[in-house]
Amino acid sequence: MAEFFDTPGGIALIILAQVLAVVAFVMISLLFLVYGDRKIWAAVQMRRGPNVVGVYGLLQSVADALKYVVKEVVIPAGADRTVFILAPMTSFVLAMIAWAVIPFNDGWVLSDINVAILYVFAVSSLEVYGVIMGGWASNSKYPFLGSLRSAAQMISYEVSIGLIIIGVILSTGSMNFGDIVRAQDTGWGFFGWYWLPHFPMVFLFFISALAETNRPPFDLPEAESELVAGYQVEYSATPFLLFMAGEYIAIFLMCALTSLLFFGGWLSPIPGLPDGVLWMVAKMAFFFFIFAMVKAITPRYRYDQLMRLGWKVFLPFSLVWVVFVAFAAKFDWFWGAFARWSVGG
């Protein structure tokens, strides 16, 4: 039996099992993310939230998913049918394949490539095409305006996210997530992670992640009061479910990136306690809680304010920070906090 797993067929079976494990984790997490998002929003508004289907309403997301699946897919008469159907599939698939390089523990990763950050950045940049396709194929002004807003917004904040990540790459000397996490394993626990030397960038990265994933207060592409529901106006049933799932998976991915880049990934915050996947999952859950709280308590930005914030505040500040980190790493300032090449690599 052991010899079988050394054959091409056995290796392919192992890879398939690993892929299915990651997909299962993301999809099960998705159900609880939607439930948690609704519960947190309800708690802030002093409501109960989902509480009927299952114990404490835990199966509400399953019921909603089944409802969307069994509904009829309605395609507008003037829509481009092929692109209309491909758009949500594109959005969902691109959100899923980004997880191929995300490690949950030391060695627990589908593809441990040296350019993992570049891969995630490339895939996340392509996600805007799903939104644009959906808005254009609907043949309606509201979806089209929403998709144009989304394109401008995602491109604007991708620049800042890229520059912030470059600062982390300069400190580590690697684009591999495993190397970045190991570079934060200094023996100081919570205070040895990158959030401390890169403290200003943590806030910029988090706010840019909100804009990148179209989350409140930056949900301009689907602003109900302005565009009805943006690029999702004409969608229903399974295509709408795929759009929504892709959006939440992208949010969860940003939570994972925040954990890996600045908060030690699977490392324990307390020296002496064992590291492991539970720390990684706990950190991702905590950052999603922050995402949900921001959605519940912040008013929506105006579109011109959103663009001004991205281009006139975040971009210059992140550019200056990259230059600062480059000098700090080169000349070993701040006791080597910005130059951990030997640790990470």
Swiss-Prot record:
Enzyme class: translocase
Hydrolase is among the record's keywords: no
Reaction(s) this enzyme catalyzes, per UniProt: a quinone + NADH + 5 H(+)(in) = a quinol + NAD(+) + 4 H(+)(out)
Gene Ontology CC entries for this record: plasma membrane
Record field: transmembrane: 14-34, 84-104, 115-135, 161-181, 187-207, 248-268, 277-297, 309-329
GO biological process: aerobic respiration
Cystine bridges: none
Keyword ATP-binding (UniProt): no
Location(s) in or outside the cell: Cell inner membrane
Subunit organization: NDH-1 is composed of 14 different subunits. Subunits NuoA, H, J, K, L, M, N constitute the membrane sector of the complex.
HAMAP family, alphabetized: NDH1_NuoH
Family statement: Belongs to the complex I subunit 1 family.
Protein role: NDH-1 shuttles electrons from NADH, via FMN and iron-sulfur (Fe-S) centers, to quinones in the respiratory chain. The immediate electron acceptor for the enzyme in this species is believed to be ubiquinone. Couples the redox reaction to proton translocation (for every two electrons transferred, four hydrogen ions are translocated across the cytoplasmic membrane), and thus conserves the redox energy in a proton gradient. This subunit may bind ubiquinone.
Protein name stated in the entry: NADH-quinone oxidoreductase subunit H
Species per Swiss-Prot/TrEMBL record: Ruegeria pomeroyi (strain ATCC 700808 / DSM 15171 / DSS-3) (Silicibacter pomeroyi)
Organism ancestry: Bacteria, Pseudomonadati, Pseudomonadota, Alphaproteobacteria, Rhodobacterales
